[in-house]
Amino acid sequence: MVNNNKRKEIENQENDNDDDNDGLLTYKKFKDVDYDSIRSKELQTIAKSLGLPNNGKKQEVYKRIEGYFLSKKVKNDLTNSTTNQPPQLQQKQPQQKQYVLLIKDVDQLEIYFWKAFRNMIIFKNIFSNFKSKQFGYHDLIGINENFLKSYSNSLEIIKDNIKGNINHQIIRSVNDIVNIIKTLKKKDNETISFYTTLFSTFSSSSSTTTTMQSTKSLIFQFDENIDLWIQRMILNENLVALDQFIKFFKINSDVLKKSIEMHINPSFFNVFSYNNLKIYNYLKSINAIPTSHIKQRFSNIDLSESLSFDYKFKRLIKSYKLLVDPTKFKEIREIHQQQQQQQQQQQQQQQQQQQEQQKQQEQKQQQQEQEQQQQQQQQQQQQQQQQQEQQQQQEQQQQEQQQEQEQQQQQQQEEQQQEQQQQQQQQQQQQEQQEQEQQQQQQQQQQQQQQQQQQQQQQQQQQQQQQQQQQQQQQQQQQQQQQQQQQQQQQQQQQREGRQLQILDYIEKLDQLILELNEIQFSHFTDDQLNSTIKNLLNQTKTTTTTPILITNNNNCSDLKDIIKKYYKSIYLFLKIIEEGKHDRNLMRPFHYYLYFKKKMNVSQLYEIFCGFFIKKYDDCLIFFKSILIDQQLERNQRLELVSKILDIENGVSFQNIGSNFNFTSFNSFCRVVFSTNDTELIDHLIKTIKKLQLAQNSKTQFPSISYIISINFQYINKNEIVDFFFENYRNETTLFDDQNQNWNNNHVNIIDHIEKIMESIGKKLQLYFVKYSNWFTNGNKNNEKKYNVNILLDQLKRAISKPLLYSFFFDSGYYCNTTLLNIFGWSLENGNEVVINFFLPNEIFKQPFRFSDIIYGAPSPNKIPNLIKLIFNNISKESIEPKLYQVKGNFNIPHLYYGRDDFIPLTSTISTTNSEEVGQFIIGETKSFDFIISPRMLFICLYYLDRFEDIFYLFDKIPEIFSSTYFPNFTKESYLYNICSSYYLELLINYFIENLNDNTINHLYNCLCVASGKGFTQIFKNILSSNKNSQSLLKVRTKTNQSSLFQLNFLCGMVLKSIDSSNFQLSNLLIDSIDFPPKNKRVLNQKYLVHLIINK
């Protein structure tokens, strides 16, 4: 491993409680490192020195190093706590105990049994008679969910594997443990004991043997990555594993908090689910929730799913106890009381502020008015002064003009007297007159300028007035805005007060409910009640008259139904309080809550609530429509009106989804309920209403045809009168009475009898669509209702077969017919009803050969496949198979991708018919033969399932061409053998190929060895190594000097890589050490092995 010496030095000398370890990086020192200042290369160097992968981003490497130190801290704390224990508390070395049999009177036969059972020779002789060696303990490969769910004793198998150190194939990597954590979550003593054993075995403090310890070190150790295992257990919501993990390694809250901060997103705890609440409450109870991860509010609340009425009653009680925490509720109540007090104080402060604001506004208005008045007065004074100045100037000008005129008159008089003297001066006077005219013009201009100035002053006054008006308008707008803001604030305040009052009302109601429910304990209910679904319990309270449990509280009694309602109401109120209306739509109660508990609501109100649920499941729709059409016991007119209202697409939304087309789920369930009423008038009203609405339908409201509606719902009719009604009124609008129609299926014998009579009277046949029955016989149909329907369908099939003049069969194609037959056979074997197979196979209708090649991938469960094969191949011998193989022998060398018709072998088998008679343990009666075709590959698989390997080898010897490289690899190819072959038979094949080596069998031998390597069958390779001849030919590199070996270097490297890729580390070590690889190739394989080992840790 990378820099192992440095890592061991740190592991041996590191002590987190000692700060004097200069030169060594401790957890405390690493925590002091500034993440922003340290460079990525430095972190990579530290990771490399610790033997950790140093690839990835800076944050990934940092978390990897921090996780390493957290794990070291847990190891040191665990070692110190064990060392510091008083001697009397430390574990004592186990001493050999003498076991005493407590039962005194033991039957003599039992003593003989145990003597024989413990005798190895007798034991092996007895169990050698058990032929089935397909799968054994050594064939269990890894751990997946199928393994954990398929085997009821899966826990015990894993325990035995861990304790016995058997093959190290069940737990081979981290992924195997993760699959365990994903699956095993049930809290019981068995699971708790299992996890304790698991953690004890795969930890550095384990006291197991040296061999086991070395094997474990090849896989992983839990305390190497404490933080990552905490992350995996929390994310997979496995509380049992997490609790035992914390207790076993004595992990303190600081380590848990740090691990959660490193690897868990805070939003993970905001999910509203049952398991998430369990994990969160547990971590909170041990003070392991970081501040950043404290649940503030739920990110998504879907009560219709999380509080479904399909869950068990005890889960509802546990959900209530997990969610409605009295301590948290007390804190919430105190918080809301404080908020109410704060709101009252805020109201008083707001009122004072409003009063002060009003006073300030009034003062501002007064000041503004005074300023405006002053400005107006000043403007008036200025105007008056300007006018006075202008008048004075005009008066002066007038006086000057008068003086000038008087002077001019005097001068004229003198001129008249002295005409002769003034003639010489006339030119001068004319000039003076011109000057006077100019002066007059100037005066006029001055007057015009004065007028313009006056106009400008008037305009300025108007502008000032407009500005004043605008200011007044702005002030008014500001006042209006302030008033609107005040109104909005008042409305918001009223809403807050209303919500606060509503929440306080919720708190009072919830407080009362908590007091009532605190008196209820699990012991008050029976186990049947606790393990029953809520829906079943509520249905029982309707139909039964058994005495319900009574809980007395303040002289108030409540039955089981009322208790269930209180649990739901308490959870709903609690979520309303903590969410404060943030998720009103998701906080809608499950629809069944309204059906069972809101009896005061009328049908219209229930219908409106139902339309508000966008996700409508078929069963929920059935319950709703049944409750309003049948359980409500409405009068005839009310039922007719209700049908019309539900079908009214324009006013209702029951059959529409937003953004999608017609909702057939709710419509089909509605029609089913109407037909189930067997009310002729109601059914007729439904059909006629749909016909009217079809005239105005569009792409989103397109109803199915009337023929489809009648045909698909005919199965729910149980009265002959309804059949006659359809025949008389809708014969031309439905295919129900057409010749060769397939719509006659019904679950009631009287209806089938009646329609048979009608069809016989009109001279027409019914048709049975055989392929349509296929899905009814698959393993998916597990509930009782469908099992009942399967029995009815089988009766219908038998009826049709027994009446060939009235029924015809439609097979569609041979493939689907064969699939349906196989599904029927699989169902028959699953339910122990092999008589059905005896009825169908020899029948003339199914006489054509059917294809058997899809049986492995068909309907029967894997553990039932051998039974079906045994039933069909019971009378087929190897001698009868041999000539059939010779017939297709010529095709073995023809390359092809898919098998054609010529590649299938026709075979014939016999089976007892239903006419046989049982006599004791034997069946005496008529036997009939039936034909089928099968590919050679599938033939060998069937022989393999029947433990008939001797027959396979017999056919190999008789027909060597079967080993052709173009054909036989389809059976011995690696991927196929990996899925079906056990270690026992795989070793048989390997030995057979070794004894019969040729150019073809070498390829098959290599495939088998690759399968053994990939599966981790270490014992097969140990057996090969124990034989010098086999080891030299199989596990040595073929070179020019070593021609005795079969495989070249690249083939052997590929075989080793199979074990590395499959995490078979023990086998990988064995093969790398045993095969004579060149140093370069051995180095490459070791590097790949180490990289894969680090990744899996």
Curated annotation (Swiss-Prot):
Stretches assigned to coiled coil: 329-521
PROSITE patterns referenced in this protein's UniProt entry, alphabetically: SAP (PS50800)
Region (Disordered): 1-24
Regions of compositional bias (Basic and acidic residues) in chain numbering: 1-11
Matches recorded under Pfam families: SAP_new25 (PF18953)
Entry similarity comment: Belongs to the UPF0746 family.
Name of the protein this chain belongs to: UPF0746 protein DDB_G0281095
Native source species: Dictyostelium discoideum (Social amoeba)
